[in-house]
Curated annotation (Swiss-Prot):
The gene is trmB. Keywords: Methyltransferase, S-adenosyl-L-methionine, Transferase, tRNA processing. Signal peptide: none annotated. This is tRNA (guanine-N(7)-)-methyltransferase. GO terms for cellular component: tRNA methyltransferase complex. Belongs to the class I-like SAM-binding methyltransferase superfamily. TrmB family. It is an enzyme of class 2 (transferase).
């Protein structure tokens, strides 16, 4: 299958992306909805959830991506491989995130935000993915002990995400150092592999939902 070509950055504030994410009938996309669920926000081509689903058949994986062609391609790949613990959704996670998470199964255990679009300019801060409303929604959806993994190769972006989650009293860091040297999940994203090959640093942290 030919690789889908897409725009690198998409403005999440444009009218096209202002619809609330619609959750599927979970029983139709997963063969066992009781498995713990990992949500990967901004999954791009979905290679990370795909590899995780292959390596961890005892978990369900959900990728959310704002670029629809990538979601269509990713679901086609998952279907072709017969993975019953993997699904992708198209949409903007920051449109009424509480409503989106309220339709989740009660099995959410982990959320990851990895290498999001950086939106460097100060006036574009509202386009960044880790908005306060999303952080609150994640905190409300995760059970005690649930995890959040944050990664970026752009230090100001990583620091901004880190600060947003640190400001929420429902999260604590699992490590004493500012950044983790290694990916705690052991499965790199495509961007992470590229950074490794270029000897470019990656700034990552892992948080846990408090009781």
């Amino acid at each position: 299958m030919a690789r889908v070509r897409i725009r690198q950055h998409v403005n999440p504030l444009s009218e096209k992306y202002r619809q609330v994410l619609a959750c599927p009938d979970w029983a139709t996309v997963y063969d066992d909805v009781q498995r713990p669920l990992h949500l990967d926000i901004g999954c791009a081509r979905g290679r990370f959830p795909l590899k995780m689903a292959q390596q961890h058949p005892d978990w369900n994986f959900l990728g959310v991506e704002i670029r629809q062609p990538l979601v269509l391609e990713a679901n086609e790949t998952g279907d072709r491989l017969g993975l019953k613990n993997l699904h992708y959704l198209f949409g903007n996670i920051n449109v009424e995130p509480e409503k989106f998470f309220s339709a989740f199964p009660p099995t959410l255990q982990r959320v990851s935000i990895q290498f999001p679009d950086p939106w460097f300019k100060q006036r574009h801060n509202k386009r960044r993915v880790a908005q306060p409303e999303l952080v609150t929604a994640i905190a409300n959806a995760l059970p005690p002990g649930g995890e959040v993994l944050l990664q970026s190769d752009v230090e100001p972006v990583a620091q901004d995400m880190r600060d947003r989650f640190a400001e929420n009293d429902n999260f604590v860091f699992t490590h004493d150092t500012p950044w983790l040297a290694e990916n705690p999940l052991g499965v790199p994203t495509e961007r992470e592999i590229a950074c490794f090959n270029l000897q470019r640093p990656v700034y990552r942290c892992l948080l846990q939902r408090t009781p």
